[in-house]
């Protein structure tokens, strides 16, 4: 009987160990997303805006939760062939994981999914001159994410009407990546 209890405990602990990186899709602990991130993939329904020199091709390097619940993003983007560093604050809204910012129009930024330790997926809706653009971005804590996270990102893109032709692998694309 004791042997069965010990075996059950060992199996429970082993199962818990494999679920350390469970995806979170709501009720985010925003303090846990603070830190360094690397852009892995980006997708949009307007490819011009995320292609080289596109105004929405942003390489987040660091995220910081501010005291008021807003997020500070330190990122880079290409401007006339040069990698330029910029800091931007996305203001929190009444919804957990939702933020707003004025950049190249009006933007709603949603944290879609994260496990805090490996990856994070953001959705941004930009409205510029009456035109709506969707952008999704996959970031990792390390420079290269595994294929599992990339497949999950592709599945989420599909939910927003974007297929594999709308996704750019950013790990091999720009000077701003490193």
From Swiss-Prot:
GO terms for cellular component: extracellular region. Coiled coil: none annotated. Gene3D superfamilies: 2.40.128.20. The keyword Ribosomal protein does not apply. Expressed in epididymis. Not detected in all other tissues tested. It is found in: Secreted. Keywords: Disulfide bond, Glycoprotein, Secreted, Signal, Transport. Disulfide bonds join 83-176. Its main location: secreted. Residues 1-16 form the signal peptide. Glycans are attached at residues 46, 68, 129. It holds the Pfam family Lipocalin. GO terms for molecular function: small molecule binding. Belongs to the calycin superfamily. Lipocalin family. This is Epididymal-specific lipocalin-9. It comes from Mus musculus. The gene is Lcn9.
């Amino acid at each position: 009987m004791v042997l069965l209890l010990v075996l059950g405990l060992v199996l429970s602990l082993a199962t818990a160990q494999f679920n350390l990186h469970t995806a979170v899709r709501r009720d985010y602990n925003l303090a846990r997303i603070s830190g360094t991130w690397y852009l892995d993939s980006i997708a949009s329904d307007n490819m011009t805006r995320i292609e080289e020199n596109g105004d929405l091709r942003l390489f987040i390097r660091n995220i910081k939760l501010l005291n008021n619940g807003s997020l500070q993003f330190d990122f880079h983007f290409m401007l006339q062939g040069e990698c330029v560093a910029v800091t931007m604050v996305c203001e929190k809204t009444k919804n957990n994981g939702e933020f707003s910012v004025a950049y190249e129009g009006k933007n709603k930024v949603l944290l879609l999914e994260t496990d805090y330790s490996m990856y994070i997926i953001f959705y941004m809706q930009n409205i510029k001159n009456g035109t709506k653009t969707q952008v999704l971005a996959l970031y990792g804590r390390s420079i290269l994410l595994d294929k599992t996270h990339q497949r999950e990102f592709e599945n989420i893109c599909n939910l927003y009407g974007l297929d594999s032709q709308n996704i750019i692998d950013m790990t091999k694309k720009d000077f701003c990546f490193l």
